[in-house]
Amino acid sequence: MGPPHFVGLGAQKAGTSWWNALIHEHPLVHRAGGQPKELHFFDRAWEEPVEEADLRLYWQHFPRPEGGVAGEWTPGYLIDFWTPELIARAAPEARILVLLRDPVERLRSGITHQLATSRTPLTHRDIQGAFQRGLYAPQLRRVLAAFPAEQVLIGQYEACRADPAAELARTIEFLGLPPFEPSAGALEGAVNPTTSRKFEPSPALRRALLEGYAPDLEQLSEIIPGLDLSRWPSARELGLA
């Protein structure tokens, strides 16, 4: 029992369920019986101060045998401005994992999921909220203000899809774990497939999204020198890659 060895912070609809499942295939990565991938432990931390006793309650989610490691991945942590600092208090030595995705594609996937799971009509607030989640620069600045850069691994969903074996090996090495072979088919598997009709923004909305994301994409190159913007159709369309 103790602080988590790793915490995944985001981003939503960027392949985190798939990637978390791959990490948990490692024989040294332990998950308590019945524990979900997403704990959402800090979601309501804005309501009242988080005390040291609360942080110790968080630790109780991570029992593991001697020599094993444990962690969680709650994608919503990335956008909640209060969360990186709280995780740094709870687990100052944790390895932090972030997966990013082309922001327009991430928005399309997020709205598609919402339409498939919600009975309420889509509103402009839904689009605005989904747009905000794709503004990665301020979110990553908060993460890097709370943790040293060497404790943070920022990957791209598109790179994971293109070469999952190499990206998983990089992730496992970052976590300080020995190499392993995932089960057959796990590297290619989709954890959250959808059969619903995909949301397609209108040409006007797509142009507005591109214009809205352009300044953020330019900042990302400064924050993450190794980020390959050429993997993102949005960046290519904007002439940033």
Regions of interest found by a model, annotated:
Residues T83-P84, R108-T112, A165-L168:
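Short aromatic-enriched loop/helix-cap "lid" or pocket-rim segments at secondary-structure transitions
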Residues G15-T16, Y58, G71, I87, ...:
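Generic structural signal for small/hydrophobic residues in well-ordered secondary structure
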Residues D80-V98, A137-P138:
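ATP-dependent NMP and nucleoside kinases share a basic, alpha-helical "lid"
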Residues M1-T74, L78, A90, A94, ...:
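PAPS-dependent sulfotransferase catalytic core
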Residues Q35-K37, R141-E222, G226-A241:
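The conserved 3'-phosphoadenosine-5'-phosphosulfate
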Residues A91-G110, R133, A190-R197, P201:
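N-terminal hydrophobic signal/anchor transmembrane helix of membrane proteins
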Residues L55-W59, P84, L140-R141, L217:
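Generic structural signal for well-ordered alpha-helices
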Residues E51, Y136, Y213:
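Aromatic/hydrophobic pocket-lining residues that form the small-molecule binding cavity
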